[in-house]
């Protein structure tokens, strides 16, 4: 890494001394992996206060339910072999304590450096972390989006409602066990004069296969 990035890395590592974290550099950016999700708010607060990470650019999450699984195992470039259409396969059960990871992207304009803060969430049944809306007001909508898409709850959020999906929507679309076709379909009923919801009649099919290529 460059001398400049090394200096920032050393400073960030020093600031977080005492927390159970792992700091490393990947793809030219500093990454911080928090071991205990109860430390998320404290770590982020310290980064903002002591290294001027005053801008939260994004919050997202990853669902590792199907990590390492594929629809086809291939040893060649896909374009050389092609795929047959197939039905969506069922999912295997993931490690309940490592299914979800939450990710924060921070920017310090004063130091001209970015960090990526990540934390594996320990309970996939009731997923709850502390809100950082009190640190960055922009977290309000970002946390609502993560809740809407992944079903992760945020303690002390002032208005934790869905922000992208429709009223009465069931499920969380970016979870790996959410069907690509959804659960219901919507159409306008001319006889009733209103929009109605009906169970989806389309079978799940593999249109964009998940592939692990053996190099």
Curated annotation (Swiss-Prot):
Q: What does this protein do?
A: NDH-1 shuttles electrons from NADH, via FMN and iron-sulfur (Fe-S) centers, to quinones in the respiratory chain. The immediate electron acceptor for the enzyme in this species is believed to be ubiquinone. Couples the redox reaction to proton translocation (for every two electrons transferred, four hydrogen ions are translocated across the cytoplasmic membrane), and thus conserves the redox energy in a proton gradient.
Q: What does the entry list under GO cellular component?
A: plasma membrane
Q: Which Cys-Cys disulphide bridges does the record give?
A: none
Family to which the UniProt record says this protein belongs: Belongs to the complex I 30 kDa subunit family.
| Localization terms from the record | Cell inner membrane
How is the protein disposed in the membrane? Peripheral membrane protein
Organism lineage string: Bacteria, Pseudomonadati, Pseudomonadota, Gammaproteobacteria, Thiotrichales
On subunit structure and binding partners, the annotation says: NDH-1 is composed of 14 different subunits. Subunits NuoB, C, D, E, F, and G constitute the peripheral sector of the complex.
PROSITE patterns recorded: COMPLEX1_30K (PS00542)
Write down the species: Francisella philomiragia subsp. philomiragia (strain ATCC 25017 / CCUG 19701 / FSC 153 / O#319-036)
The broad enzyme category this protein falls into is translocase
Output one GO MF annotation. Answer: quinone binding
Alphabetically ordered keywords of this record:
Cell inner membrane, Cell membrane, Membrane, NAD, Quinone, Translocase, Transport, Ubiquinone
Which EC number(s) does the record attach to this protein?
7.1.1.-
Record's catalysed reaction(s): a quinone + NADH + 5 H(+)(in) = a quinol + NAD(+) + 4 H(+)(out)
tRNA processing keyword on record: no
Q: What is this protein called?
A: NADH-quinone oxidoreductase subunit C
InterPro entries per the UniProt record, alphabetical: NADH_DH_suC, NADH_quin_OxRdtase_su_C/D-like, NADH_UbQ_OxRdtase_30kDa_su, NADH_UbQ_OxRdtase_CS
Q: Where are the transmembrane segments?
A: none
């Amino acid at each position: 890494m460059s001398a400049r990035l090394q200096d920032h890395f050393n400073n960030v590592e020093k600031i977080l001394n005492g927390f159970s974290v792992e700091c490393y550099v990947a793809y030219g950016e500093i990454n911080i992996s928090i071991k205990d999700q109860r430390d998320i708010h404290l770590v982020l607060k310290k980064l903002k206060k002591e290294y001027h990470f005053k801008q939260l650019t994004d919050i997202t999450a990853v669902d590792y339910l199907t990590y390492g699984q594929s629809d086809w195992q291939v040893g060649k470039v896909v374009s050389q072999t092609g795929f047959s259409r197939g039905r969506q396969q069922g999912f295997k059960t993931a490690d309940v304590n490592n299914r979800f990871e939450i990710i924060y992207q921070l920017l310090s304009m004063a130091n001209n450096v970015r960090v990526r803060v990540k934390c594996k969430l320990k309970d996939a049944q009731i997923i709850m972390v502390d809100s950082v809306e009190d640190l960055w007001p922009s977290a309000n909508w970002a946390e609502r989006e993560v809740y809407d898409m992944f079903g992760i709850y945020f303690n002390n959020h002032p208005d934790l409602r869905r922000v992208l999906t429709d009223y009465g929507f069931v499920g969380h679309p970016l979870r790996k066990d959410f069907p690509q076709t959804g659960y219901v379909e919507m159409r306008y009923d001319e006889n009733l004069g209103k929009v109605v919801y009906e169970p989806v009649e389309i079978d799940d099919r593999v249109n964009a296969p998940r592939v692990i290529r053996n190099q």
